[in-house]
Design a protein with these regions (language model features):
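PIN/NYN-family metal-dependent endoribonuclease catalytic core
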Residues: 8
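Enriched for short, Lys/Arg-rich terminal
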Residues: 1-5, 13, 21-24, 39, ...
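A short, compositionally biased N-terminal segment around positions ~18-40 that is enriched
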Residues: 19-33
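A short, surface-exposed loop/turn module that caps and links secondary-structure elements
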Residues: 29-56, 104-111
């Protein structure tokens, strides 16, 4: 199954600030696999909130939701040290989007 990836400005800001080029490349490779339906290691945190788990880069995490069965919306990212705050932020973004359809400013990304 092929997914269309979209990202929020919060996610883009975080991802663009990753300093380690190897971590960024591995992250991009993982997102390319997600786009092709291979999510790898992930955890469902709530009915519509998921966490991609990485075992490099300080325990990198990407929080996402799936819309319409075909669109993966990348909400925020972080690592183990910011996990609690990142989950709260992702939940807030989802709540806002649920109350006001189309409120999430996002852009389509492809690999």
């Amino acid at each position: 199954m092929k997914y269309e990836l979209h990202s929020t400005p919060d996610f883009n800001k975080w991802f663009n600030r990753l300093k380690d080029a190897t971590v960024r490349q591995k992250g991009l490779a993982r997102l390319a696999r997600v786009e092709n339906g291979n999510f790898g290691d992930y955890k469902q945190l709530a009915a519509d909130l998921f966490e991609l788990r990485f075992f490099f880069g300080g325990g990198l995490r990407i929080y996402y939701t799936i819309r319409g069965g075909l669109v993966v919306l990348l909400l925020v990212g972080g690592d183990k040290s910011t996990q609690v705050a990142d989950i709260e932020k992702a939940g807030t973004i989802l709540l806002k989007s649920g109350k006001q359809k189309g409120v999430i400013d996002h852009e389509h990304i492809s690999f």
